[in-house]
Regions:
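C-terminal structured domains
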Residues: 5-9, 19-34, 38, 56-60, ...
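Structural alpha-beta junctions
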Residues: 60-72, 126-133, 150-156, 177-181, ...
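ATP/pyrophosphate-binding catalytic subdomain of soluble kinases
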Residues: 191-252, 262
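A generic structural motif
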Residues: 69-79, 134-138, 159-162, 186, ...
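Acidic, Ser/Thr-rich peripheral helices and adjacent loops at domain boundaries
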Residues: 87-96, 153-162, 174-183, 256, ...
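A broad structural signal for short, well-ordered beta-strand segments within beta-sheet-rich domains
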Residues: 102-103, 152-153, 215, 260, ...
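An N-terminal, globular interaction/scaffold subdomain
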Residues: 1-137, 142
Length: 313
């Protein structure tokens, strides 16, 4: 059975790979009222069935604000036969009642062994004048190699989806050492952003700032699927406060609902700092961050489904 035979029509017009550029020119010639806009190459890679359709909807929303040439890539590596199919479409949005501003999308479905097909065939359709942002969805596979990341300017990952985070980060660190221009963005780290900003803002208060050397306990409540976000913000707190580690922050512990993990640090003044990570299925990615230092207690809370944080001092 062809692993790519059932594709949603929203992917657009199926075209022979060798005719992609010609078909794109024809697409624009069919409607002169549309304007082609592109500021970056934006590629989304996945090995999950159904990802092309899901990611096409992602690109449709993204192009409302960000002009790009989008490339969707799905690969079924375990399929016995090497095949490749391609579709083209344009996501168009009206701007202030003027012409439709449209962004090109090329979707590729590949099966079987790659043997250079990703770089030589798929990447041949990048706009060579524009930087490449590459969003890798899911666990890193052997396809993540120098032949890929040497072409990438910004590499987006989400370590929350990794079954082996230690191996994944080792691969990313090796790529960074090999390709200094590469910029890596982890969506799990991005999920901690508002908490980090809130902590920094609260410790601008003179009372809270004076209490930093006296911090005794840190408690972080998180969703089981986002344990790494909790570890990342704990590591950030330890780094900012210059605590020394009593026990390494293990990446490979099981994700267990209701599980409590305990960590111990030593402050710059020699005090013991105890940290707890509490796994709660009812929590958003990060639900609560509580810091206690003597009589001072700082708490940052996000309720499930809320778009804002509450800060208590």
């Amino acid at each position: 059975m062809n692993a790519t035979q059932d594709m949603h029509p929203e992917l657009g017009r199926e075209v022979p790979v060798g005719r992609i550029d010609r078909e794109l020119r024809q697409l624009w010639a069919e409607d002169e009222a549309r304007t082609n806009a592109s500021l970056i190459n934006f590629a989304i890679y996945s090995e999950a069935p159904g990802s092309l359709e899901r990611n096409s909807r992602v690109v449709e929303e993204l192009t409302r604000e960000h002009a790009c040439r989008a490339m969707l890539i799905y690969i079924a590596r375990e399929h016995p036969e090497p095949t490749i199919r391609a579709w083209i479409t344009a996501h168009c949005h009206l701007r202030a009642g003027q012409k439709s501003v449209c962004c090109e999308q090329i979707a590729f479905a590949l099966t079987g062994q790659m043997k250079g097909r990703l770089r030589n065939t798929v990447f041949a359709h990048l706009n060579s004048d524009l930087p490449l942002t590459f969003w890798w969805q899911g666990e890193l596979s052997p396809i993540f190699s120098e032949r890929l990341y040497s072409l990438v300017d910004r590499f987006i990952i989400d370590c929350a989806s990794w079954g082996d985070p230690a191996a994944g980060f080792a691969s990313v660190l090796a790529a960074l050492a090999d390709s200094p221009k590469l910029v890596v963005q982890d969506l799990e780290w991005t999920r901690t952003f508002q908490f980090r900003v809130s902590v920094a803002a609260m410790f601008d208060d003179p009372v809270a700032q004076a209490a930093i050397p006296s911090i005794q306990t840190v408690t972080i409540r998180h969703h089981p699927a986002h344990r790494l976000a909790a570890l990342q913000i704990l590591a950030w707190l330890a780094t900012q406060s210059k605590w020394s580690e009593g026990r390494g922050l293990q990446l490979d512990d099981a994700r267990r609902p209701g599980a409590v993990e305990n960590f111990h640090f030593e402050s710059r003044g020699g005090r013991e700092v105890s940290a707890r990570l509490v796994s709660d299925p009812s929590s958003p990615a990060l639900g609560t961050l509580e810091i206690v230092a003597g009589d001072v207690s700082v708490e940052i809370v996000r309720e499930a489904g809320a778009s804002h944080l509450c800060r208590l001092l």
